């Protein structure tokens, strides 16, 4: 199972960008159940927030609703244990924002095979495999198409 960061969802549903097609491929693979994935309520909230800055609220909420079942049904972490681990990561990893530290803690606690994100701050973590959602990253996750 992989864990998705907001960047994957934003690029998959956003405007032209070098990461858009690889992120779309990954989201499609998740929807087709070719790869198991999870994320957090915070990631969905951030995605909806970013989307609502460029589109109307109904569009943003609809995409959030579509994304939730595909990415949230596979893992439900202990909020207390994950938050404690996330706060430790936040405290000890200067480049990591608080919300990203909690996401990394979810990935580590879930035994995820990868945390997929365009954010380079995740590369500084030793207990989470960070995969950039570019063409090479998608080959590592989905194999060569």
Curated annotation (Swiss-Prot):
* Domain PINc residue range list: 2-129
Enzyme Commission code(s) on record: 3.1.-.-
- Which residues of this UniProt protein bind Mg(2+)? 5, 100
Keywords assigned by UniProt, alphabetized: Hydrolase, Magnesium, Metal-binding, Nuclease, Toxin-antitoxin system
Main EC class of this protein? Answer: hydrolase
What cofactor is this protein dependent on? Answer: Mg(2+)
InterPro entries, per database record? PIN-like_dom_sf (IPR029060), PIN_dom (IPR002716), PINc/VapC_TA (IPR052106), VapC_family (IPR022907)
Q: Which GO terms describe its molecular function?
A: magnesium ion binding; RNA nuclease activity
In the UniProt record, does the keyword DNA damage occur?
no
Family according to the record: Belongs to the PINc/VapC protein family.
What's this chain's function? Toxic component of a type II toxin-antitoxin (TA) system. An RNase. The cognate antitoxin is VapB7.
Its recorded name reads Ribonuclease VapC7
The source organism is Mycobacterium tuberculosis (strain CDC 1551 / Oshkosh)
Show the taxonomic lineage.
Bacteria, Bacillati, Actinomycetota, Actinomycetes, Mycobacteriales
């Amino acid at each position: 199972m992989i864990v998705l960061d907001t960047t994957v969802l934003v690029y998959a549903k956003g405007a032209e960008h070098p990461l858009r097609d690889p992120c779309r491929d990954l989201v499609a693979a998740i929807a087709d159940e070719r790869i198991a994935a999870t994320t957090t309520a915070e990631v969905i909230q951030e995605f909806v927030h970013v989307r609502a800055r460029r589109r109307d609220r109904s569009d943003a909420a609809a995409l959030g609703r579509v994304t939730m079942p595909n990415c949230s049904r596979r893992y439900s972490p202990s909020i207390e244990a994950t938050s404690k681990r996330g706060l430790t990561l936040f405290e000890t990893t200067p480049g990591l924002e608080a919300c990203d530290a909690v996401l990394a803690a979810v990935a580590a606690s879930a035994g995820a095979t990868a945390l997929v994100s365009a954010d380079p701050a995740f590369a500084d973590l030793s207990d989470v495999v960070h995969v950039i959602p570019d063409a090479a990253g998608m080959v590592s996750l989905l194999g060569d198409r």
